[in-house]
Amino acid sequence: MIAARLAAVAALMAATACAARAPERPVGAAAEAPDAVQTLIGITAHCRPLRTATAEIRLSGRAGRERVRARLVSGFAAPASLRLEALAPFGPPALVLVSDGANTTLFFPREEQVLREAPVAAVLDALTGLALDASDLRRLLFGCVVGEGGRGLRYGSAWQVVEDGDTRAFLKNGVLVAADYRGWQVDYAAHQGGIPRSVRVRRALPAGALDLVATLASVEINVDLDAAAFTVAVPPGAAAITLDDLRAASPFAPPAP
């Protein structure tokens, strides 16, 4: 059973093209620029509020020792609900991760294996190295990493930066192109209606680098989502697995001797 589950996770790992070069960050001396905060507020109007969001996601890049390619169907609802389905070429999904903020389930339909009550961030960390909870992932994907406060700075004529605690949002020529968010480097591109359709996430981790690009399509925000969207029907006979089992299949796990 464990071998089958490992195969399901491995099905998400495949050769893919290298990620595109990221936009550079500004360098040099900064000047105070309170207007940068208002500029950011104006171009991220969809974030206030970002009550719900759905999108199809094509994920590519590298996680640890593995190249990654996956197709996901995603749904999010504030404050901490999510649904991620990793689609297979045919038949049932490779996996389904759901959480309503209180209860979290990871289900492998093909193997009928289930992990219950592990934190969302721990599950995503084991699968991809992206250790974010549902709320942080929603904000990161849709470019809502900074609120309405913060300190505005300007670098030269093109760059504006908004700092808010440990988060920095980078605007180039009035467009949100990057962010440093809770230790993650994020690059945004291909905006439509202010929402980025290409999101690159990078971080150097002790077990290897993470460099993933999420390409978003069919994006809808603030639509009504039924609470059932954040649950999954698990057959009574599904075999229970542990977070340690999942970590053993992680692309960041040490290779077997």
Over which residues does each language-model region extend?
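Sec-dependent bacterial lipoprotein signal peptides
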Residues: 1-18
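N-terminal leader/targeting segments and the immediate start of mature chains
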Residues: 18-69, 111, 234, 241, ...
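Beta-strand-dominated lipid-handling architectures at cellular/organellar boundaries
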Residues: 56, 67-73, 79, 185
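Hydrophobic lipid-interacting interfaces of membrane-associated proteins
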Residues: 58-64, 89-92, 106, 111, ...
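Extended lipid/amphipathic-ligand handling interfaces
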Residues: 72-76, 97-99, 187-191
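Gly/Pro-enriched, hydrophobic low-complexity segments
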Residues: 150-257
